[in-house]
């Protein structure tokens, strides 16, 4: 529910009418401290039909309670509900069979960060793997010699994160 994310969408608030209950579990507004008037009105309208709302951060709960007449619960990030053995089972066997750096960015527009990762990789003599192909093609960070891992999804993300020598986010 972070209004500053590139893929922010009304669809995340289930705006269609229907008879099903609308419940959020551990939504995140990110580090948003202030919501402009237009977004505030939209969020207020979209949350009106929710039966229950929970978020991950106290700040998000405070923000949403000010916009709505709802009691907003703060709940644990769902990634923290699994044990190490659960995560190991999910991630599976190593997908890249050599040492590497995993760099995850939601957009790759940060030239300074890209350059930092590139220099670090050169120092360590390691290849840098990235995912998030839609952003890759928009920002074209090939000049930094990053390798786009062609598969994607939660399991790929977790696997690349788990087995990397170094991770940059």
Please report, for each region that a protein language model flagged, where it lies by residue.
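A donor-sugar binding/catalytic signature common to diverse glycosyltransferases
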Residues: 158-169
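Short, well-ordered alpha-helix to beta-strand connector turns
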Residues: 19-20, 50, 144-145, 163-164
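Aromatic- and Gly/Pro-rich donor/ligand-binding loops
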Residues: 1-45, 114
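Acidic, amphipathic alpha-helical patches
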Residues: 43, 117, 157
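Short, acidic/turn-prone active-site loops that include or flank metal/cofactor-
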Residues: 76-82, 133, 151-156
């Amino acid at each position: 529910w972070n209004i500053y994310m590139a893929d922010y969408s009304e669809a995340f608030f289930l705006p269609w009418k229907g008879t099903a209950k609308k419940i959020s579990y551990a939504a995140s507004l990110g580090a948003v401290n202030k919501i402009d008037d237009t977004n505030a009105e939209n969020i207020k309208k979209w949350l009106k039909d929710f039966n229950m709302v929970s978020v991950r951060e106290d700040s998000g709960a405070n923000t949403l309670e000010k916009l709505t007449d709802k009691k907003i619960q703060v709940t644990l990030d769902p990634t923290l509900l699994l044990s190490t053995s659960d995560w190991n089972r999910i991630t599976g066997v190593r997908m890249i069979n050599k040492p590497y750096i995993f760099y995850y960015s939601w957009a790759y527009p940060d030239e300074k960060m890209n350059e930092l990762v590139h220099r670090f990789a050169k120092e360590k003599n390691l290849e840098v793997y990235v995912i998030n192909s839609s952003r890759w093609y928009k920002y074209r960070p090939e000049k930094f010699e990053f390798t786009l891992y062609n598969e994607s999804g939660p399991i790929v993300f977790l696997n690349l994160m788990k087995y990397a020598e170094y991770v940059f986010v």
